[in-house]
Amino acid sequence: MPINIPDDLPAYKVLTAENIFVMNQTRATTQRIRPLKILIVNIMPLKITTETQLLRLLSNTPLQLEVELIHMSTHDSKNVPKEHLLTFYKTFKDIKENSYDGMIITGAPVEQMPFEEVDYWNELSEIFEWAKTHVFSSFFICWASQAALHYYYDIDKYLLKHKLTGVYRHHTNQRKMRRKILRGFDYQFYAPHSRYTTVLKEDISSNPNLDILAESDDAGVYLVASKDGSQFFVTGHPEYDPDTLDKEYKRDKEKPGVIAELPKNYYLDDDPSQEIQVKWRSHAYLLFSNWLNYYVYQETPYDLSDLHERKK
């Protein structure tokens, strides 16, 4: 949260120059505060697991959030009880007249398919288009980041020779450290990945509306942001639980015809009989709290009905 200090205090200029969020008294006295409306579009098969992971990260701030969950009405979810969907989830049709301060779209295990062959692609495309005028800032995870880059910027994804799985070291783009999403980041940090496809750095770098903020020598581009902070694309899975990659590895070993790739830098000494090394938790909390605080809470209009005018 910001600190509120007098406008003319010497520390104000020093801290501002260090990229510390300081709120002057003039702004503090005119702030109006309300709960933030956050929409989670959950397209992961294990919806209960994913919603729990995301809510855990979102809860790690003093901000009050009102969270709504939706699923794809054009897709039959087989790994979640129907009662759970009926009780806790809505569909896009139910909420499309609403506006939201923030939206998160999860990953999905469909990256080996062309986008247009995914059975809910038309519905998801409608959400992408709707978000332009009804969501202040959007956060796309793994496959959703690739899908959103494709929809908004015509950036393609490419099939990897082998599944990328593990916990990889990343480095921040030090020329972009003044971007608020990177506040408090170490120059190097770890994050999980689990995917069969990738996007190319040169495709993103050539777009003047996008910034690459973090990447990995082994896993490629990780964190991309639109210049205006309305869109964030995360190619990995910072929300993963400690044992998620372990469960995926054991699941893949049971699938006939599937080569189960050992998650890299995950087990002690890369030995699956050894304990899991959790290296990404602090990064995940910081990433989500920075997004919520700097790009949602501090910037969104108090009256969400104003969002339509701002987004035109």
From Swiss-Prot:
It is found in: Cytoplasm. It is an enzyme of class 2 (transferase). Its EC number is 2.3.1.31. SUPFAM superfamilies: Class I glutamine amidotransferase-like. One of its GO terms (cellular component) is cytoplasm. Coiled coil: none annotated. The record marks S194 as: Important for substrate specificity. Transfers an acetyl group from acetyl-CoA to L-homoserine, forming acetyl-L-homoserine. Belongs to the MetA family. PANTHER family: HOMOSERINE O-SUCCINYLTRANSFERASE. This is Homoserine O-acetyltransferase. The gene is metAA.
